[in-house]
Amino acid sequence: MVRISVLNDGLKSMYNAEKRGKRQVMIRPSSKVIIKFLIVMQKHGYIGEFEYVDDHRSGKIVVELNGRLNKCGVISPRFDVGVKEIEGWTARLLPSRQFGFIVLTTSAGIMDHEEARRKNVGGKVLGFFY
């Protein structure tokens, strides 16, 4: 597999394993951004538990899948998004208004678009899942 970005490779392997009906998937290499992205997905119930395995190299993450993930992806390049522009990005990326989440990296950390709107912070778009 050609390494485009670590986050893109991790989300793509999760999506492919979900389509094949697998119960768990191993993501490697790991990064802090992937772990924060997975925490947001887990908070909304799209994945089960995940575990970081330190192999004294770049590390691995084993993710439990629960069959709820339909699509996930990375937005590249990471566009700047203000608080007022979040609504336009959700309309463009997600299938409906109340379905799915956009993940942003902000000055307050990595969070979904609803939490960013509540905290009134903008940032850069990392990706989406639904």
Curated annotation (Swiss-Prot):
GO biological process terms held by the UniProt record: translation
Pfam families in the record: Ribosomal_S8 (PF00410)
An annotated GO cellular component: cytosolic ribosome
Protein keywords: Ribonucleoprotein, Ribosomal protein
GO molecular function: structural constituent of ribosome
Superkingdom to which the source organism belongs: Eukaryota
Family: Belongs to the universal ribosomal protein uS8 family.
Entry-linked PANTHER family: 40S RIBOSOMAL PROTEIN S15A
Name of the protein in question: Small ribosomal subunit protein uS8x
Gene designation per UniProt: RPS15AD
